């Protein structure tokens, strides 16, 4: 099982703002693009992939929306509009939830009022965490554990205080090359490397 976490620091937790944020400061299109490139392949979708989108621009709690490729039945297509609609349905389903509550949205999609920090602490129990860093080991040379989880951010970098807690969780740094890439581009390269290795 391969897992991805997108920490979307600018992404709002209100459906109207998600839809209005495409191409604006929130850059909510990154949610759809990352989701598309993690789960979908031509005429099908990948098995054994989990994607966690953590939306952090909120008045109450972050929303962690989880997509399980093995459980998803019909997401409505893999174009930007359909994928953002799935995110919106999850956000709408989360209204009225208290902190650290979980709710099933539809097959393969759950929403939790859970922070990024709490999520990665939970994932670290049975995954090896990897963070993108230009100074990390180049992915083609890096040793990738059996249950990898890759941590990505939107256009707002990971806050410095997060690095220490991620280090304590045993997070390893890997590099995808000399250029800074979009999260949606990172997942294409990561998936390709894992495919070539026969993961």
UniProtKB/Swiss-Prot annotation:
Entry GO MF terms: S-adenosylmethionine-dependent methyltransferase activity; tRNA methyltransferase activity
- Pfam families attached to this UniProt entry: Methyltrn_RNA_2
Keyword Metal-binding listed? no
Q: Name one GO biological process term.
A: tRNA methylation
Mainly resides where?
cytoplasm
Q: What is its EC number?
A: 2.1.1.-
Q: Where in the cell is it found?
A: Cytoplasm
Q: What is the enzyme's class at the highest EC level? A: transferase
Record has Transferase as a keyword: yes
State what protein this is by name: Putative pseudouridine methyltransferase
